[in-house]
């Protein structure tokens, strides 16, 4: 079987993503009924972290265990990668000792180079450019809660970061409308825009009539020196009750977490009845289990 990687959302086709969601439903049902499912027994996942994480580590490590396999945590500072070993050499060695690799790092180029030298599937656990595993869970969560996402409207409010970039790819694949509103100076790069996306200078206009409103922190990891400036620049881009009223009455709210209540989202929203952030976070576990199964075993008949 050809080695497949998941480095950005569009690495998988619509048909493959829909298949993953079918498997997610089945695997999640097994989990909820406490039924053992060990398709990856004796398989090993290597998890390489340059950026720290809670949800990414927990979901991959627990997920691999629940599929019957094992997970090894590697922090770059504690390995030869942190002492100058080339990405290519590390990929050659690590991929000969495990069955699948998840990398969470800063630059997309690093994970591309790693995959280029790996003998096994490589998964993007997050880079500055993309966060495909997050949007896998987000799209699945919307479908689980509200049905097909095709033809719906998603409002992205805030920074044009890795999560936003991945929503842009998802909109094109799943054929939904993406309204993007960012402060001046934080706009989406022109080359990332597509026919399913529209930019708004007014966040309320972006949220109007949306089926889903979603956001992320104003200051992503690696941009901490800009924190005070960003707080000033983003103050009108908080998702609050008024913004949710502009969306549809049955609109959902999502956030990839961790969240800063009182900044990018009001406490009344993230802790309110339209919020599905906890379901969204849990679904990282289930969608990634389906992804691991697919990358290692292909389609299960």
PLM regions and their residue ranges:
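Structural/interface elements that position substrates and couple domains in central-metabolism enzymes
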Residues: 1-301
């Amino acid at each position: 079987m050809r080695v497949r990687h998941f480095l950005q959302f569009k690495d998988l086709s619509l048909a493959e993503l829909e298949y993953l969601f079918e498997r997610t439903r089945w695997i999640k049902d097994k989990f909820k009924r406490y039924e053992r499912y060990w398709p990856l027994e004796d398989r090993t996942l290597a998890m390489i972290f340059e950026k720290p994480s809670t949800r990414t580590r927990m979901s991959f490590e627990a997920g691999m265990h629940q599929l019957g396999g094992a997970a090894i945590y590697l922090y770059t500072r504690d390995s030869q990668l942190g002492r100058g070993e080339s990405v290519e050499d590390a990929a050659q060695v690590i991929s000969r000792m495990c069955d699948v690799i998840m990398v969470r790092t800063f630059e997309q180029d690093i994970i591309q180079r790693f995959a280029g030298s790996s003998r096994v599937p490589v998964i993007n656990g997050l880079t500055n450019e993309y966060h495909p595993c997050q949007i896998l869970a987000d799209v699945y969560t919307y479908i689980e809660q509200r049905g097909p996402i095709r033809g719906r409207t998603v409002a992205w409010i805030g920074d044009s970061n890795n999560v936003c970039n991945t929503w842009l790819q998802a909109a094109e694949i799943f054929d939904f409308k993406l309204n993007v509103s960012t402060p001046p100076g934080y706009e989406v790069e022109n080359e990332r825009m597509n026919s399913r996306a529209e930019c708004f200078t007014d966040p309320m206009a972006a949220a109007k009539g949306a089926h889903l409103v979603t956001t992320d922190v104003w200051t992503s990891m690696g941009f901490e020196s800009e924190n005070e400036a960003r707080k000033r620049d983003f103050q009108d881009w908080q998702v609050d009750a008024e913004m949710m009223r502009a969306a549809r009455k049955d609109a959902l709210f999502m956030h990839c977490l961790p969240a800063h209540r009182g900044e990018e989202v009001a406490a009344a929203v993230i802790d309110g009845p339209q919020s599905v952030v906890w379901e969204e976070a849990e679904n990282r576990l289930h969608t990634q289990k389906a992804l691991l199964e697919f990358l290692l075993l292909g389609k299960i008949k």
